């Protein structure tokens, strides 16, 4: 596609405020964290399809999260790299389904939504036969929670001992001033609230609340395709964590005031709790700082926090009781741990879903199904049924076991 065809196109705005792009841009920066390279995809497409893809992706970028746009772009990159496609029709969809296989068949949902919008926008190169083929194919839902099911020592929930060792270690090293306040607060919030990393790094000072009922965090929703900081859930926290977060906010305010040599008390509430100090340092004028304060620009990057979290166990010598190796630590394991602990304590599926901020109870079922106490109880109940039956089949005390089996069945009704 010649650049002159798209250079005159309008500027498109990403879902996240502050970020925009043109169709001709090689790189579309969608928020502080994520960007996409759509021209790597269109370089693999026939000429008459290129503009259609770019326009549809631009529409998506204005409506959906950057992570979702990355998923779309990455999937199309692999699809058009694996086979030659002149138009997206039933044959192309069939080939994609074969290419994905049963394990990744769920990704067809991404394609289905995207090309349906493509077709509705009346852009060429998507045939109605493609949509009909997608209706015929049985799309298998993504199997989530495998690490929870297996109680994976490296990816699944932490044991009580492992969890306590982590919390004790960061507390010890924080008081010894060997770990920074922001990382200490971040790990505690992951452990206590079970919230997703993006929810925590989206927090602002005004989200920290103290009243006669206690201490709270007003945590923004992020996964359910919400706009940046538009919907929230209130979470209660302990007073000691409130104090630590207040101290962190004070440090952030002092850093900004020192940088610009001006007081910002009136804007304190807008300060990110987890602030990217490098971005503050790079900003030249207080006017530019205030202009970007309502966006995600000065919030810490998730990738940076994940890397710091990953290195904590080796830095502070925290090992797994199951493998004797350094614990593989990430935010997801804290969520798994909270869900599993609640299930062990007998919490209902609704309570677990609310605690983990799940959109529905479906994602929380994995904790109830795989609660070890539930498994033990089921096994105990079934053994009364299977033990006499297996003895009969093996010829052991047939009459006695037959009576046991008949009694069990009759008692069951």
Task: Spell out what each predicted region is.
Residues 181-196, 341:
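Short pre-functional
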Residues 117, 222-304, 308, 404-407, ...:
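Basic, alpha-helical nucleic-acid-contacting "clamp/cap" segments
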Residues 182, 306-307, 322-345, 362-363:
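Short basic/aromatic active-site micro-motif
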Residues 1-32, 311-319, 372-413:
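Acidic, low-complexity interaction regions
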